[in-house]
Each structure stands twice: as structure tokens, then as C-alpha cells.
Amino acid sequence: YEERGQYLQALRAYGGAEDFDGVLRVVEKDAGILLALLPPEQVLSWLDRCLPEVLERHPLAMLVLMRSMFNWRRIPEMLRLKEQLLAAIDARPDMSGEERGNLRGECDLIMSFLLYNDIAGMSRLHRSASAQMSRPAVSIRRQGGWTFGSPSVLMMFHRQAGRLDCELAEMDECMPHYYCVTNGHGQGAEHIMRGEAAFLRGQLDDARIALAGAYAQIRDNGQENMALCCDHLAWRLSLCTGEAPRQDFDQRRRELLCQHNAAWLNILNSTDAYYHALIGETESIPEVFREHRLASVRYLAPGKPMMELIENQVYLAQGAYAEVIGRSQQLLAVCDAMHYALVAMHVQLQTAGAC
């Protein structure tokens, strides 16, 4: 399985045999992409049974696991792995200064996620990572997800009412430093965010220009996550301009099925659901949203509020107004805790529409 790149099967096989060197080797190769599809409890069980000296032989896997723990909102476990990593580096007098810098720099990169959606705060750690590292990050790959499953960049990074222009400027300034240490992971995010902001302000020509720039920047670079964020903006723009996106949902779905990545299909389904809810075609909404089965899908924690917002829009389109009103208090509390100002505004508008 490992040699064929079938990393989920390899992880289960090595874990079942308690070959934790094998588990950690595959974790490093996968860089957390398919690992995210496993239940966090399973991964934590492996770590509990793995001897410390085995774990310390795999510092790159420890970095991947730190990021995975953030994705799963297992912050104490993330911090514990950080301490183990730094101790493992200090315990290796034979390690070159260059490799120490690479590992410590990549640790700073991963720790930046604890400042998630504080653009300037994250960038301070990205710059620290860049100053220490002589190679791109190993624990973050260009082909991996960037938005934690969210179809929107702006919903992730609009943190405070009245600061949108500052946030856009910060993205323009800060993203190049992140690209430098990740080999261009998430490329185009600042253009997508600017396009989304222009769309919400009714500046449709500016939105179209930013969208075209984002599509051009990510063309042929293998970052499907960012292309799907472009698609999300394109479908919303089509409601105002009448211009059809480059592919319809069925074409896009067939294309994604060939990649065997459930995360990409989940993002496409969310855009499909949101678009058809907005135009009132509830029978065309993907079943997982139409039948309200989101609990059956393993969404990463930072992307979950966007899925809840879209499910709210589906409830609204279905006339299930009591559901929208009843869910609002809990959703708004989550948005407040995560500093999701734009998601909160959408939920408030949906709740008002249901009253």
C-alpha cells in the first residue's frame, strides 16, 4: 500500500500491526492530506501506544501531526507534540544546524495556525519560519487543502467589521511570505478574497477581474482547493451577471471524481447546495445538504461554520424557518469564538429572513 501511495490503507495496516515506524513514515509522506479523513481518536490511539523514542525518530511526522491536531481542534495534543519535537531536536547533537533551523522554522509555521484568521499575527510566524528555513515546508504540500474545507476565503479571514480594506491589504502583504515557505501552497488566496469582497460590495467588474486573475494564477498548479474557491465565487457572480461559470456542476463533479479526494467533492457539494438554495431549486441541492446529513461528513473544525451557514440557507429555501431561528444562537456563538464576522452576518440575515 505504501509503495502505491495508498496511504489510508497503509496507515490502517501498520497501525493494526503496531508498526509505528511504518505509521509515522506514511504520515510524513501523506503530509496530512488523507490523514484528515481518519477519526482523530484512531490517530491518538496510535500515538498513545507509540514509544517516545520511536516518535522522536520521525520529526517531520511530528510536524504533520501537530497540524492535524489543530485541524481536529485537539490543541493540548498539538502543544504536547511541539514540546516533544523541540526536545527531540535538542537531544540530537549530531543534527546539522541547517536541519535544526528547518525543523524549528517549520514548527513556527505550524504554530501560526493558533493565530488563525489573524492575518498579521500569522504572518509574523511565517516570516520567522522563512528566516530559519533553507527549504520549503515538508508538512504542508501544494496539493493539500488550504481552506479547511471552506468554499470561501473571505468567510475565513474577514475578522472584524469595518476592517475589510485593512484585511485585504494584509493578505496582499503577507501571503508572499507564506508562499515562500510552502512552495506556493494556497496560491491565489488574496485574489479570491479581493474578488469576493468586490462581489459583496456590488463591484461586479472588479470581482470578475479578480476572479480571472485568480484562475490564471492557479492554472495547472494542482491546487484544486483554490480552484473550487474560484468556482464558488463564479457561481455567485453568475446570479448577477448572467455569465455561466466555466463548467456546470455535473461536469465539475465528474472531473473531481477522477481525483479520489472526498474533501474536494465536499467543497463542490457545498457550493452546489448554496447556489441552488439561493435560486430556490431545492430538489437540485445535493442530498447531503437537502436531507441535512452533514453529521455523516468529516469536516475540519475551521471549515464547519461555513457548512452550517450553507445548511441554514437550505433550511431557509425549504421553508423550515423554525430550524433557522432555533440554530442561530449556537451558530453565532461559534462565529464569535472563531472571529468569523462575515459568517455571523450571514447567519443574522438568514435568521431575520426566517422571522
What do the PLM-derived regions correspond to, one by one?
Residues 5, 18, 38, 73, ...:
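Residue-level detector of the short coil/turn that links helix A to helix B
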Residues 8, 19-21, 58, 95-105, ...:
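Alpha-solenoid helical repeat architecture
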Residues 7, 13, 33, 46-49, ...:
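Residue position in alpha-helical solenoids
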Residues 1-68, 77, 81, 355:
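Extended alpha-helical scaffolding segments used for macromolecular assembly and cargo binding
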Residues 10, 43, 78, 122, ...:
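Single-residue signature of alpha-solenoid repeat helices
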Residues 54-229:
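Internal alpha-solenoid helical repeat scaffolds
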